[in-house]
Design a protein with these regions (language model features):
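Proline-centered structural pivot motif
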Residues: 38-44, 55-70, 78-99
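Signature of long, low-cysteine stretches enriched in small and polar/charged residues
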Residues: 149-210
């Protein structure tokens, strides 16, 4: 009986290696919000350590930036400005025409007025939101406005509800009005009872603070 012979054939099976999956790309880290204008604030030079910057002494009060008590009355120039007195001679800043009185109305209620004083040499304007703008003509200035508030609400409660201040500084103006300010003292809120006056210091592109004592003087004049 014949038997068909089948030739043996070596079959080579190549091992197929599956490619490893590509690793998933790592998520890009979230970018933190960065204020492009956030720079460190530089205090103005105070050569005689009297509480007034040299710029304030030269451009507003006509005092000697190297003499802490220009009129030799026993009071530092900066202390006199804080209390709204003329540091160069007897009399108040208002009496001597160094500051002028401004009367403003709360935007939402034109029948309710408040007043404050500011340096007479500064330029003023009012923007479309009824914000009063003070231009010191040195790249610095102030923005002042008022918003209505329930007279029964404390300034502390209003500040917590309406602002983002962290650890605000509490104080009282020379006219006895409650006041809150930021840690750097560049923004302040004064309780008018029926409203809150807001005063913001605009340090400008150079981020200098030459008018901090003048800001305190203006806050002390609010009524």
């Amino acid at each position: 009986e014949e038997v068909d012979q089948v030739a043996e054939v070596d079959v080579v099976v190549e091992e197929v290696t599956e490619p490893e999956p590509e690793p998933e790309p790592e998520p890009e880290p979230e970018l933190e919000a960065v204020d492009p204008f956030a720079v460190e604030v530089t205090p103005g030079t105070d050569s005689d350590s009297d509480g007034l910057s040299d710029t304030e002494e030269k451009t507003i009060y006509n005092t000697n930036p190297r003499l802490p008590d220009t009129d030799s009355d026993g009071f530092l120039d900066g202390n006199e400005v804080f209390h709204r007195y003329n540091p160069a001679a007897p009399g108040t800043l208002l009496e001597e025409g160094i500051v002028v009185l401004e009367t403003r109305s709360v935007a939402e209620s034109e029948t309710v007025d408040y007043t404050f004083t500011f340096p007479a040499v500064w330029e003023t304007s009012v923007d479309s939101d009824d914000v009063f703008i003070l231009d010191a003509q040195t790249g610095q200035g102030f923005r002042i406005w008022a918003v209505e508030k329930d007279s029964a609400q404390s300034l502390d409660a209003w500040t917590e509800d309406m602002t983002t201040l962290e650890e605000p500084l509490e104080g009282t103006t020379k006219n006895g009005l409650p006041m809150m300010s930021s840690q750097n003292q560049l923004i302040a809120y004064v309780d008018l009872g029926f409203a809150v006056l807001v005063m913001e210091y605009d340090t400008g592109l150079k981020a200098r603070v030459d008018y901090l004592q003048t800001m305190q003087m203006m806050l002390n004049s609010v009524e």
